[in-house]
């Protein structure tokens, strides 16, 4: 990857519940980011997205020029024309070119991304599941996330979000991989970014409980047998005591 380039970040509107007295002291029940768009000279590339409570509501696929809903519920009562996003990206590109000409082109500081891999639900062998690769602290928003299975590149069954914005102006991105857990397979999430000296591999493999050894099984069976025999002996003793204590009372009652 080449060194970092200039990027422009435009955000139109933040909000949910605002008052006329300033927003810094307000605790809102819900927060939405509308019209978050980024364009950068590397590529060139960019993205446009709407977010709600930290989740991506939808993004616009700039290549296909269509709106892609990540929260389908919202698409039932609203729509978004992707042409609006394309106009915003074009404006950002124009402004970026002006800023480049007027600046000294000082490269932004490349942050080191933080990578975590975990399953969506508890792992059970043979039961379909999803692996999640959560990449945080991304800046600038140029990154490549791929999956490896047993050391080989995975070519299908995965998807990812666009860049999600954070309050500190860094970004996060999440990649999903559907898989069938097996004790013979292991996975790696491979992350490439300008903040890394070399690609980062985050390893994951299912944690399968180790089978009991033959000695352990023998001990467990022996303990179970002993407990069973003790139970039989104790039960027999109680029955005999009960018969002895009940004998005289039955004899006296017949007189």
Curated annotation (Swiss-Prot):
Question: Which residues, renumbered to this chain, are glycosylated?
Answer: 104, 144
Keyword Mitochondrion listed? no
Q: Where is this region: Alpha-1?
A: 24-120
Protein origin, superkingdom: Eukaryota
Q: Which GO terms fall under biological process for this protein?
A: adaptive immune response; antigen processing and presentation of exogenous peptide antigen via MHC class II; peptide antigen assembly with MHC class II protein complex; positive regulation of immune response; positive regulation of T cell activation
Chain intervals for the UniProt region annotation (Connecting peptide): 205-217
Q: List the disulfide bonds.
A: 133-189
Kindly give the SUPFAM superfamilies that the UniProt entry links to this protein: Immunoglobulin, MHC antigen-recognition domain
What is the protein's membrane topology class?
Single-pass type I membrane protein
Q: Localized where?
A: Membrane
Q: Which UniProt keywords are given for this protein, alphabetically ordered?
A: Adaptive immunity, Disulfide bond, Glycoprotein, Immunity, Membrane, MHC II, Signal, Transmembrane, Transmembrane helix
Q: Name one GO cellular component term.
A: MHC class II protein complex
One Gene Ontology molecular-function label: MHC class II protein complex binding
Report the sequence similarity comment from the record: Belongs to the MHC class II family.
Listed name of the protein: SLA class II histocompatibility antigen, DQ haplotype D alpha chain
What organism does the record attribute this protein to? Answer: Sus scrofa (Pig)
């Amino acid at each position: 990857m080449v060194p970092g380039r200039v990027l422009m970040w435009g955000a139109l509107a933040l909000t949910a519940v605002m008052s006329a007295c300033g927003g810094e002291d307000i605790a809102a029940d819900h927060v939405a980011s509308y019209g978050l768009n980024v364009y950068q000279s590397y590529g060139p590339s960019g993205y446009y997205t709407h977010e709600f409570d930290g989740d991506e509501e939808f993004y616009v696929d700039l290549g296909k020029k269509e709106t892609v809903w990540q929260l389908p519920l919202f698409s039932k009562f609203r729509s978004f024309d992707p042409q609006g996003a394309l106009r915003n990206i074009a404006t950002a590109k124009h402004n970026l070119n002006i800023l480049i000409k007027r600046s000294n082109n000082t490269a932004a500081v490349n942050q080191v991304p933080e990578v975590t891999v975990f399953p969506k639900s508890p792992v059970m062998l043979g039961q379909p599941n999803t692996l999640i690769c959560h990449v945080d602290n991304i800046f600038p928003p140029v990154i490549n996330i791929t999956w490896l299975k047993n050391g080989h590149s995975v070519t299908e069954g995965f998807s990812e979000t666009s860049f999600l914005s954070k309050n500190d102006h860094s970004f996060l991105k999440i990649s999903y991989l559907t898989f069938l857990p097996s004790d013979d397979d292991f996975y790696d999430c491979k992350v490439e970014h300008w903040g890394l000296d070399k690609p980062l591999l985050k390893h994951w493999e299912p944690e399968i409980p180790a089978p009991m050894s033959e000695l352990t099984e023998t001990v467990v069976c022996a303990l179970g047998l002993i407990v069973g025999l003790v139970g039989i002996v104790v039960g027999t003793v109680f029955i005999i005591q009960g018969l002895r204590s009940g004998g005289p009372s039955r004899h006296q009652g017949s007189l």
